[in-house]
Amino acid sequence: MITLTPGHLTLPQLRQIARESVQLTLDPASFAKIDAGAKAVADIAAKGEPAYGINTGFGRLASTHIPHDQLELLQKNLVLSHAVGVGEPMARSSVRLLMALKLSSLGRGHSGIRREVMDALIKLFNADVLPLIPVKGSVGASGDLAPLAHMSAVLLGVGEVFIRGERASALDGLRVAGLAPLTLQAKEGLALLNGTQASTALALDNMFSIEDLYRTALVAGALSVDAAAGSVKPFDARIHELRGHQGQIDAAASYRDLLAGSPINQSHLDCDKVQDPYSLRCQPQVMGACLDQMRHAADVLLVEANAVSDNPLIFPDTGEVLSGGNFHAEPVAFAADNLALAASEIGALAERRIALLIDATLSGLPPFLVRDGGVNSGFMIAHVTAAALASENKTLAHPASVDSLPTSANQEDHVSMATFAARKLADIADNTKHILAIELLAAAQGVDLRAPYHTSPKLAPVMETIRGKVAHYELDHYFAPDIAVIAKLVGERAFAKVAPFSFASEQ
């Protein structure tokens, strides 16, 4: 059970919400602020004075006054008309994060929503009744309206859900959670819809996957150093201290730890080779830059996870209703775009190491890592697959945040595209996962070919894990299943666990 303290969520909590089947409860310390916000909205609605989002239309229709007897209909219509998403359902882990983030934002007491509505969201979450939310349809301002409308429609008994993973109607989902359809009061529909929770949830969910891939890439890169008979001297701490970038310093330390005591390395200390290619030698510099970007993105997304991104905002102490633009997800878009650059570079560097290993001139290994080359093609086309994926990532890494299209009759004339920026991270991560799987297979093959010498004590379990699933490549065979089984292990963090390094979300 995780106690949500609005405004004080942590990265480990968020990773746990996404990756584990934990349940949620709301910190009772937040109740007074929530109730005060709801009372403030009720008082404003009762007076009848125009207040945006409470008794007016929305967007370009903000100047249209809504009579008091139509306020409930206004909120219902808002939810139903905005539930216009398309595409595949959002991943379960992302929906869980979305709901938790929405509860945190509402729980800070500046949205004017009743606890009854929040309690319903918690009951759905804890019963594993998750709204079916189409993943496409948000431009990231005014908030993630369409995705959050699909979440909110379930509270009205409209739409679809997944009940413990099985697709069902919203009404069935409410029954399983012990709920009846709600009637939303003034501003409650808008409070549920307005916010950056969809884009932030997608970005966080994919960031956790990319963090795992980063750790896997450290392991794969270190194994490739041994496979290519590369030097460990470029990882000397003194080199990296002189430059000063913390990510680079930390990455170099990881490579030193992983490669310490390698018999392969000891076997070629007196060789004539002066310098390794950049894909081996510059790993700390490249991976360090990725790490710095990822850490910055995590900081930004944690702030956003704890933010109130509603509009308008209620200030119960003064009775004021202030309209602003906290729904604009530009910080999330930038963070997601930075993560895309990092994840793409992780894959690009791994692809270059695969190319090095299969090149006999550079690696000193048999061409394409197989004996009897010619009749056997070995890793030739596995590298082509890695190259295809790396190239695809370069296109996917184009920043989404540089694009904007005006909406709502030019009232909403600049938008963030944060949801797309966050959503495409999943494709980049999947591509990078498969590139790393191919590298792990190639590096393991190279290490085998260095016999009688072995890799380091820290990397020996990696070899055992790989060889426990995939045999040494002796002769050409149907290769795709080998890649698939190692990619599955990558996704399960089997190799990430070996890296002597952890992110803030894992602590």
Curated annotation (Swiss-Prot):
The modification 2,3-didehydroalanine (Ser) is found at S142. It is found in: Cytoplasm. Contains an active site 4-methylidene-imidazol-5-one (MIO), which is formed autocatalytically by cyclization and dehydration of residues Ala-Ser-Gly. One of its GO terms (molecular function) is histidine ammonia-lyase activity. This is Histidine ammonia-lyase. The keyword Cytoplasm applies. GO terms for cellular component: cytoplasm. It comes from Burkholderia lata (strain ATCC 17760 / DSM 23089 / LMG 22485 / NCIMB 9086 / R18194 / 383). Pathway: Amino-acid degradation; L-histidine degradation into L-glutamate; N-formimidoyl-L-glutamate from L-histidine: step 1/3. NCBIfam families: hutH, PRK09367.1.
